[in-house]
C-alpha cells in the first residue's frame, strides 16, 4: 500500500500535461472504454460547471481503480469510481484536480488526467466562439474521428411493420471523436413528437427513439442523423402501422390434435388462439345424457372444464392428470371475442395399461383369458346397469333435475361457470350452473329463476330472523338494495340494531342474475375489509332467498353528495334536494379524492380491477367516509352497448380508458384513467363528463388526443394530476400508490383554514352540466392541445412502472 501511495505521489507531481479543452455538451464521456496502456499520456480536460462527467478505463468487467489526489474514490456518492468508471453527477469547483486510474492488482496507469473548471453551462455569452481562444496544441491527444456505427448488426431490421397499439423502438448506436450528437427526422422533417399522441421518448445515451401505442398516423420514414465536427452519418427506418381489423379469433389448424394415452398417464391438449381483441377461451368436454350426446334441437351437451377471461391466466393448454377411461371422448377449444366465436375439437382415446404377463402367455392361454374377461365384464356390466336404473328411479323421485355440472349449450355461448370457492369457508366448491339449456339469443340468458342449495359458510352466515327489511334504497345491475336493521351484527351486543344495506334479487331475476350475485358475494369475501370500500357484513343463504348484507352509506353516492352541496348560482338547476350542510371546503374535496385513491390502491393490491369507477359508484357514509362500491360485479364487458345509457342516465363510455373502449382491455391502469374522470367530477361538484358530446364524436376526439379542459377554480396541480391519469399510453399513467402519495402531499399543503366555496369558487356555473346539455364539441370542455400537457408538479409521468 505504501508503494502504491508513493507511486501516486510521483505521478501526481509530474508537470506539464497536455491540455484537452472540451466544449460544454450533455456529458463528458470517453467511449468506448480504453484498453490498458503502459504509456498513458497525461492530459487535461476542461469541464463546465454543472456538466455530468463519465470517464472509463479498461474493460467494463475488469476496469481499474480511480484515485483523486492520492485517495481512492468510493463506489457510491456524487463522485464515484465504479467498475472502471469515473462518474460525476454534476461538476463542481471542488471536483477539479488530478485523477488517476490504475489497473487492478498492478501499477499500470490506464488514465492520467487533470480536470479543470470551465465556464458554466448556463453562461449566456454567445457573442464569441470559444474555439477561437483555444491553442491548437491544447487539442485532445486522441485523433479526431467522424461518427461511425458501433453495433450495425442491431440496425439490420430496416422495415418495422407492427399492429396499432404496439411500442416501437429505433436505435442508432454510434461513436466518434468528439462525441457526436443525434437528431431524428420523420419524412425529412425534424421530429420532436410534440404533435404525437403520447409523445415520444428520446434516450440519447442509448441512441434510441421510443414511441408507445403507435397509430396509423405514425407511419413514415424515420431518420437518425448522427454528426460531430468531423462528419455525419444517417440511417433510415421504415415504419408501417397495421390497423386492427375486426375479426373473430383464429385457431391454428390441427390443434387441438387427436391424442391416444394410457390409463394413468398425463395428457396435454394445446389450442393456439390468435386474436387482436382480448379473447375468452373455454375448454369443453362433450358428455352423454340419457344415452345421447345431443339434445332434441341438435346441440351438444358439454361440460365446461376450464375458462379464462380478461383477468385470468392463459388457458391455451388443457392439462389432464392421471387419465382414466372416463376421460376418453371429444374435447373442444372455444374462443370468442367481441366479433364472434371459433372452435375446434379433438378426440382423446384412453387405452388400458398393458399387462407384461399378457404378451408372454401362450396363444391358448390368451384365448382362455379373453373368454373369462369377456364373460366377467358382461356380467359386471349387467349388474351395474340394473343398479344404475334402480338408483336413477330413486333419485328421479327426489330431484327431477339433471346433474349440476352439465350444460347443454346452444351455438356454444360463452357462458360462465361459477364456483363457490371462499378462502374463509374452507368448503369444497360446488357448481352454480345447473343442467339447463342456455340460449345465446336475447338479453335474458335464462328464463325463470331456480333455487340452489348453497353450502353454509359459518363465518359469514347471519340469522335471517334477526334481519328486519326496510324501504328500498335503489336498484342495481341485477337486483335491488334495501335498507335493513340487523340485530346482533356485533356479537358482543346481541340486542343492538345496526343499519345495513341488503342486496337481493328482483322478482324477474334469472339464473344468470343469481350466479352474478353469488359471484359478487364470493369476491367480497376474498377481497377482505378496508375503510374505503363497501365491506361485506354477512349473508343469508339458508331456507330462503339469497341476501348479501353490506355496509350502509347514509349520504348516498358521491355524485349526488357533491351536487346537493353546490353553492347557489344563477345557472344551477338542481336535480335533487339541497343539503343543509352548506358548501364543501377545498380540503374536503381533496379528501374525497384521497380516500377513493386509497380504496383503489387496496383493490389493486388484491388484484381486483373495478372496470366502472365513477362518482356514482362511490358511496358516502354519515361521517363523510368515501366507500367504493360494486367492485365485485361480474360485468359482461364483451357485450357492452356503448350507445345505451344506464338506468341513471350516465354513459359508461365517458369513464372508460381508450384501450378499454376500443380494444376491451381492462387493467389497473384503465381504472387510473377512470379515476382521472372521477377527479374531474369532484372538482366540478358532480358535473357530467364531456357534456353534450355525442358518443360517436367522443371516440374520434379521444383518438386525436383531446382531453377535458381544467374545471373552473381547480388548481393547476390537481388538473395536472388528471392529465397524468389520461395519458394515452397506459404504462405512463401513475399507479394508485403514486396517486395516494400525491394527494397526501396536497392535503398536507392545504391550510388548516377551510376555504369556503362561496368565496373561492364564486357563483357556481356548471360547466360540467347534465348530459342533456346542448353544447357542441367546440365548447371549452376540451383542451385542444394533444397530450402530453404541461408539466405536473407530481413526481411521476414518464417512466411510471406498473
From Swiss-Prot:
Cytoplasmic side: 391-802
Catalytic reaction list: L-tyrosyl-[protein] + ATP = O-phospho-L-tyrosyl-[protein] + ADP + H(+)
Record topological domains on the Extracellular side: 22-369
Superkingdom of source: Eukaryota
Post-translational modification: N-glycosylated. Full maturation of the glycan chains in the Golgi is essential for high affinity interaction with FGF19. Ubiquitinated. Subject to proteasomal degradation when not fully glycosylated.
GO BP terms: cell migration; cholesterol homeostasis; fibroblast growth factor receptor signaling pathway; glucose homeostasis; peptidyl-tyrosine phosphorylation; phosphate ion homeostasis; positive regulation of catalytic activity; positive regulation of cell population proliferation
Keywords noted in UniProt: ATP-binding, Cell membrane, Disulfide bond, Endoplasmic reticulum, Endosome, Glycoprotein, Immunoglobulin domain, Kinase, Membrane, Nucleotide-binding, Phosphoprotein, Receptor, Repeat, Secreted, Signal, Transferase, Transmembrane, Transmembrane helix, Tyrosine-protein kinase, Ubl conjugation
Domain Protein kinase: 467-755
Cysteine disulfide partners in this protein: 57-101, 172-224, 271-333
Active-site residues, record numbering mapped to chain: 612
Region (Disordered): 119-148
Subcellular location: Cell membrane; Endosome; Endoplasmic reticulum
Binding residue positions for ATP: 473-481, 503
InterPro entries assigned to the protein according to its UniProt record, in alphabetical order: FGF_rcpt_fam, Ig-like_dom, Ig-like_dom_sf, Ig-like_fold, Ig_I-set, Ig_sub, Ig_sub2, Kinase-like_dom_sf
Major location category of this protein: membrane
Disease in which the protein is involved: FGFR4 variants may be involved in the pathogenesis of various cancers. It has been found in prostate cancer as well as cancers of the breast, colon, head and neck, larynx, lung, skin.
Known role: Tyrosine-protein kinase that acts as a cell-surface receptor for fibroblast growth factors and plays a role in the regulation of cell proliferation, differentiation and migration, and in regulation of lipid metabolism, bile acid biosynthesis, glucose uptake, vitamin D metabolism and phosphate homeostasis. Required for normal down-regulation of the expression of CYP7A1, the rate-limiting enzyme in bile acid synthesis, in response to FGF19. Phosphorylates PLCG1 and FRS2. Ligand binding leads to the activation of several signaling cascades.
Name recorded for this polypeptide: Fibroblast growth factor receptor 4
Gene source species: Homo sapiens
Gene: FGFR4
Amino acid at each position: 500500500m505504501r508503494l502504491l501511495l508513493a507511486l501516486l505521489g510521483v505521478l501526481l507531481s509530474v508537470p506539464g500535461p497536455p491540455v484537452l479543452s472540451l466544449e460544454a455538451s450533455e456529458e463528458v464521456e470517453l467511449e468506448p472504454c480504453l484498453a490498458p496502456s503502459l504509456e498513458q499520456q497525461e492530459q487535461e480536460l476542461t469541464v463546465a460547471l454543472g456538466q455530468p462527467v463519465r470517464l472509463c478505463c479498461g474493460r467494463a468487467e475488469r476496469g481499474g481503480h480511480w484515485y483523486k489526489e492520492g485517495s481512492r474514490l468510493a463506489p457510491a456518492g456524487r463522485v464515484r469510481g465504479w467498475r472502471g468508471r469515473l462518474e460525476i453527477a454534476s461538476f463542481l469547483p471542488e471536483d477539479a484536480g488530478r485523477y488517476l486510474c490504475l489497473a487492478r492488482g498492478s501499477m499500470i496507469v490506464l488514465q492520467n488526467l487533470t480536470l479543470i473548471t470551465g465556464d458554466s453551462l448556463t453562461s449566456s455569452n454567445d457573442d464569441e466562439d470559444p474555439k477561437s481562444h483555444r491553442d491548437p496544441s491544447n487539442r485532445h491527444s486522441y485523433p479526431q474521428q467522424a461518427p461511425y456505427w458501433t453495433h450495425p448488426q442491431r440496425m439490420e431490421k430496416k422495415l418495422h411493420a407492427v399492429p396499432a397499439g404496439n411500442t416501437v423502438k429505433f436505435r442508432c448506436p454510434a461513436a466518434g471523436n468528439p462525441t457526436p450528437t443525434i437528431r431524428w427526422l420523420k419524412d425529412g422533417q425534424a421530429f420532436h413528437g410534440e404533435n404525437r399522441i403520447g409523445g415520444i421518448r428520446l434516450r440519447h445515451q442509448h441512441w434510441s427513439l421510443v414511441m408507445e401505442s403507435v397509430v396509423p398516423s405514425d407511419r413514415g420514414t424515420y431518420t437518425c442523423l448522427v454528426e460531430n465536427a468531423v462528419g455525419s452519418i444517417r440511417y433510415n427506418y421504415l415504419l408501417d402501422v397495421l390497423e386492427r381489423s375486426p375479426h373473430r379469433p383464429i385457431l391454428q389448424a390441427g390443434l387441438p390434435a387427436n391424442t391416444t394415452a394410457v390409463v394413468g398417464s398425463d395428457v396435454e391438449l394445446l389450442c393456439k388462439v390468435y386474436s387482436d381483441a382480448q379473447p375468452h377461451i373455454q375448454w369443453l368436454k362433450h358428455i352423454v345424457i340419457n344415452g345421447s350426446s345431443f339434445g332434441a334441437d341438435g346441440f351438444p351437451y358439454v361440460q365446461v372444464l376450464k375458462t379464462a377471461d380478461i383477468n385470468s391466466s392463459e388457458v391455451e393448454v388443457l392439462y389432464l392428470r392421471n387419465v382414466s377411461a372416463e376421460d376418453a371422448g371429444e374435447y373442444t377449444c372455444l374462443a370468442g371475442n367481441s366479433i364472434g366465436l371459433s372452435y375446434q375439437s379433438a378426440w382423446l382415446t384412453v387405452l388400458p395399461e398393458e399387462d407384461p404377463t399378457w404378451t408372454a402367455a401362450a396363444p391358448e392361454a390368451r384365448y382362455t383369458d379373453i373368454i373369462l374377461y369377456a364373460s366377467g365384464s358382461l356380467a359386471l356390466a349387467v349388474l351395474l346397469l340394473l343398479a344404475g336404473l334402480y338408483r336413477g328411479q330413486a333419485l328421479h323421485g327426489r330431484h327431477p333435475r339433471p346433474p349440476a355440472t352439465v350444460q347443454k349449450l346452444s351455438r356454444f355461448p360463452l357462458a360462465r361457470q361459477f364456483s363457490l370457492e371462499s378462502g374463509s369457508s374452507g368448503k369444497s366448491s360446488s357448481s352454480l350452473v345447473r343442467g339447463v339449456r342456455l340460449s345465446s339469443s336475447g338479453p335474458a340468458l335464462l328464463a325463470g329463476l331456480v333455487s340452489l342449495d348453497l353450502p353454509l359458510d359459518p363465518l359469514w352466515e347471519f340469522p335471517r330472523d334477526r334481519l328486519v327489511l326496510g324501504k328500498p334504497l335503489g336498484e342495481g345491475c341485477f337486483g335491488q338494495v334495501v335498507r335493513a336493521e340487523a340485530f346482533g351484527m356485533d356479537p358482543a351486543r346481541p340486542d343492538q340494531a345496526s343499519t345495513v344495506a341488503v342486496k337481493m334479487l328482483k322478482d324477474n331475476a334469472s339464473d344468470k342474475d343469481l350466479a352474478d350475485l353469488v359471484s359478487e358475494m364470493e369476491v367480497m369475501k376474498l377481497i377482505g375489509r378496508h375503510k374505503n370500500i363497501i365491506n361485506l357484513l354477512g349473508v343469508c343463504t339458508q331456507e330462503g332467498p339469497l341476501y348479501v348484507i353490506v355496509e350502509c352509506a347514509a349520504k348516498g353516492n358521491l355524485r349526488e353528495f357533491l351536487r346537493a352541496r353546490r353553492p347557489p348560482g344563477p345557472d344551477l338547476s338542481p336535480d335533487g334536494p339541497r343539503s343543509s350542510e352548506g358548501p364543501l371546503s377545498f380540503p374536503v374535496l381533496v379528501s374525497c379524492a384521497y380516500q377513493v385513491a386509497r380504496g383503489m390502491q387496496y383493490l389493486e393490491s388484491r388484484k381486483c380491477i373495478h372496470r366502472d369507477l365513477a362518482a356514482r359508484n362511490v358511496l358516502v357514509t354519515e361521517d363523510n367516509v368515501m366507500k367504493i362500491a360494486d367492485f365485485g360485479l361480474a360485468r359482461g364487458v364483451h357485450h357492452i352497448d356503448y350507445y345505451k345509457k344506464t338506468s341513471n342516465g350516465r354513459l359508461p363510455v365517458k369513464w372508460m380508458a381508450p384501450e378499454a373502449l376500443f380494444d376491451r382491455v381492462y387493467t389497473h391502469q384503465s381504472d387510473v384513467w377512470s379515476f382521472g374522470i372521477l377527479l374531474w367530477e369532484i372538482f366540478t361538484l358532480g358535473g357530467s363528463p364531456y357534456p353534450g358530446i355525442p358518443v360517436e364524436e367522443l371516440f374520434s376526439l379521444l383518438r386525436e388526443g383531446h382531453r377535458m379542459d381544467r374545471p373552473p377554480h381547480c388548481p393547476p396541480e390537481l388538473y395536472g394530476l388528471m392529465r397524468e391519469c389520461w395519458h394515452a399510453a397506459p404504462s405512463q399513467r401513475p399507479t394508485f400508490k403514486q396517486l395516494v402519495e400525491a394527494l397526501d402531499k396536497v392535503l398536507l399543503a392545504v391550510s388548516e383554514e377551510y376555504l369556503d366555496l362561496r368565496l373561492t369558487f364564486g357563483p357556481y356555473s356548471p360547466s360540467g352540466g347534465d348530459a342533456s346539455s346542448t353544447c357542441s364539441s367546440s365548447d371549452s370542455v376540451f383542451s385542444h392541445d394533444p397530450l402530453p400537457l404541461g408539466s405536473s408538479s407530481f413526481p411521476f409521468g414518464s417512466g411510471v412502472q406498473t
